[in-house]
């Protein structure tokens, strides 16, 4: 008995209306390289003006500035990712003279070099020549709040196709919003509404994944592999760009010691980075795809197996087990591959996880470990145990 198919294939119901359709809309004029000069303005100013116009029931003006603010947010996000991606390999600082134990100097030397690179990069990009938005405004965009206002403004402007798309885009982030669900029920009662249900923030890897699963369910193994092998690196690219965008500007509110201040900033960055995987996970048929990266490897290993390509199937199986070591189905698949290794000419290298899987697993695991440590040991002083005497402090440290 050969390897078994991923059960996810039975759960992902890919109807025509559920398939992510690339949403253009407000991004038709968007270009990272040549953003329209007439639209360059501070993101927060554009967003606040849009909401003011919304409150005044000036629907056309509100729509215009909400759409501009969405493009400005994407420009800022893409600009952050561009600079951090290009400066991630900044030339390391030369080793200082003295003992090799000066690791701290080398560390901060690298930090200074990277800061220099980022400063130069940002000086050349228009997104950073504007005043930067507050954290609360950025949070609104991450949670797709502008679409809540857009759908009603579109509706009042009698642009039902865009209202339907905006409502759907918002609901994907807020599936329990009762008012928006009622709005969507009304929209769905209209003739032809299904044609306009699309995610305006969909990513290319989502469409590729849906196509791959459809081909898989139709037993078109080569097509499924082709699309899934495109979806995987496309998702990872978006993931690492999301991590980079988390390293943007920060509001400094507290006056703290040097290391505590650095730790506070880094924990805030970690909070953002840990959310990246969840934020980027596709929502299909109203449900997020669980363990998205692992699921792609599950589909790949079975499709490769169906083509008798065990040299590619085995690494996908091992990659999947990085993320779910207790999965009995995949364990059995791996036993099958091991048993037939001589027949298929498999060597030890075919039973190693793929490099991109290892990198993704290591990054996400280490980020979670660091964040958990910070949550446990770097809480506010008023939440932790107060130690009054030095002897008590030393005893506490020794027991730890």
UniProtKB/Swiss-Prot annotation:
This is Cartilage-associated protein. Glycans are attached at residues 86, 362. Residues 1-25 form the signal peptide. It comes from the Eukaryota. The gene is Crtap. Necessary for efficient 3-hydroxylation of fibrillar collagen prolyl residues. InterPro entries: Collagen_mod_leprecan, Leprecan_dom, TPR-like_helical_dom_sf. Belongs to the leprecan family. One of its GO terms (cellular component) is endoplasmic reticulum. It is found in: Secreted, Extracellular space, Extracellular matrix. Its main location: secreted. Keywords: Extracellular matrix, Glycoprotein, Hydroxylation, Secreted, Signal. GO terms for biological process: chaperone-mediated protein folding; negative regulation of post-translational protein modification; protein stabilization; spermatogenesis. It is linked to Defects in Crtap are a cause of osteochondrodysplasia characterized by severe osteoporosis and decreased osteoid production.
């Amino acid at each position: 008995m050969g390897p078994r198919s991923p059960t996810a294939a039975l759960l992902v119901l890919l109807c025509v209306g559920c398939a992510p359709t690339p949403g253009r809309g407000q991004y038709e004029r968007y270009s990272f390289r040549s953003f329209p000069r007439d639209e360059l303005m501070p993101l927060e100013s554009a967003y606040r003006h849009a909401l003011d116009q919304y409150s005044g029931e000036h629907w056309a003006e509100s729509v215009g500035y909400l759409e501009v603010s969405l493009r400005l947010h994407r420009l800022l996000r893409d600009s952050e990712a561009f600079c951090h991606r290009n400066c991630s390999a900044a030339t390391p600082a030369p080793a200082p003279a003295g003992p090799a134990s000066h690791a701290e100097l080398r560390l901060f030397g690298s930090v200074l070099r990277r800061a220099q690179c980022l400063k130069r990069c940002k000086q050349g990009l228009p997104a950073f020549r504007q005043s930067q938005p507050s954290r609360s405004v950025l949070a609104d965009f991450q949670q797709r709040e502008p679409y809540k206002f857009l759908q009603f403004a579109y509706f009042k402007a009698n642009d039902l196709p865009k209202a339907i798309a905006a409502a759907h885009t918002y609901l994907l982030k807020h599936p329990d919003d009762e008012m928006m669900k009622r709005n969507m029920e009304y929209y769905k009662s209209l003739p032809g509404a299904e044609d306009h249900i699309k995610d305006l923030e969909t990513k290319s890897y989502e469409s590729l994944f849906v196509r791959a699963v459809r081909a898989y369910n139709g037993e078109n193994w080569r097509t499924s592999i082709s699309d899934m092998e495109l979806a995987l690196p496309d998702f990872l690219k978006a993931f690492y760009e999301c991590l980079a965008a988390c390293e943007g500007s920060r509001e400094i509110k507290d006056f703290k010691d040097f290391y505590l201040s650095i730790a506070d900033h880094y924990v805030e960055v970690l909070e953002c980075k840990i959310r990246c995987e969840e934020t980027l996970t596709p929502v299909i048929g109203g449900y997020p795809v669980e363990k998205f990266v692992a699921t792609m490897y599950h589909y790949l290993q079975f499709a490769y197996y169906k083509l008798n390509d065990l040299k590619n199937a085995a690494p996908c199986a091992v990659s999947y087990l990085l993320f779910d070591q207790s999965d009995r189905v995949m364990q059995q698949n791996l036993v099958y591959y091991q048993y037939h290794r001589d027949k298929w000419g498999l060597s030890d290298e075919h039973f190693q996880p793929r490099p991109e899987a290892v990198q993704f697993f290591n990054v996400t695991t280490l980020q979670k470990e660091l964040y958990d440590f910070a949550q446990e040991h770097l809480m506010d002083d008023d939440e932790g145990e107060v130690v009054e005497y030095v002897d008590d402090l030393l005893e506490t440290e020794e027991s730890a």
